[in-house]
Amino acid sequence: VTSEPGARLDDLVLHLAALAGTPTLFNPYADTDPTVDGSDAPAIRRGNLGRYLRAFMDRDEIDLWLGEAPSRFGARRTGVPFSGEGYLADLSSRLAIAPFGIATDEALATRPSSTSRQIWSALPARLPLFWNAVMHHPHRVGTPLRNRTPTRSEITRHREALTLLIAAIRPRRILAIGRVAEGAAAGYDVPITYVRHPAQGGAAQFRAGVAEFGRDAS
């Protein structure tokens, strides 16, 4: 059994890559989208996620911000939750790590999702760790760039990844962004705070919830 934290994080990335995708669930760590990806895109995304996770390895009092699933313009393309290509340079700078790789061949998604814009605008100075209840991109049949809510069975299949993450990182608190994330976060010995998901008119409530979450830490 692997016990060293860095090796456990590497195992986590490999675990996500080994989880098979489906016709409506794109695995960014193993699968290639021929319309936008370079041939080595899955390896780049695995490298991005591994580098991102290792940046938190020696940090104390980490807050975990848990979302629902990747968006079409976020981790589906980059491998890093809540982070499309347009945020990668800022993220690597704030984490003081080497630049992330670009896995796609075209620049469409310098355009962020509305959810990621709200999340990035609400970030505290001390960065939280981003994760999703489902780390593969759920989409509709025949429309790979149309987001959908993950199913209960998909969340269950990805629970082991969340368990591995929590064991390796040991977050002090979880900010659950939306009810799907709140349900996925249950059952761990980590305090959970629910905030309204910023989509579909929830932006103001989301910002207020994040602000209160930040005050509770002080």
Language model feature labels by segment:
Residues 212-218:
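A polyampholytic, Gly/Pro-enriched intrinsically disordered region
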Residues 140, 200-211:
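Short, charged, surface-exposed secondary-structure boundary motifs
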Residues 3-175, 181-188, 193, 200:
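A polyanion-binding, active-site-adjacent surface
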Residues 1-4, 218:
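Polar low-complexity intrinsically disordered regions
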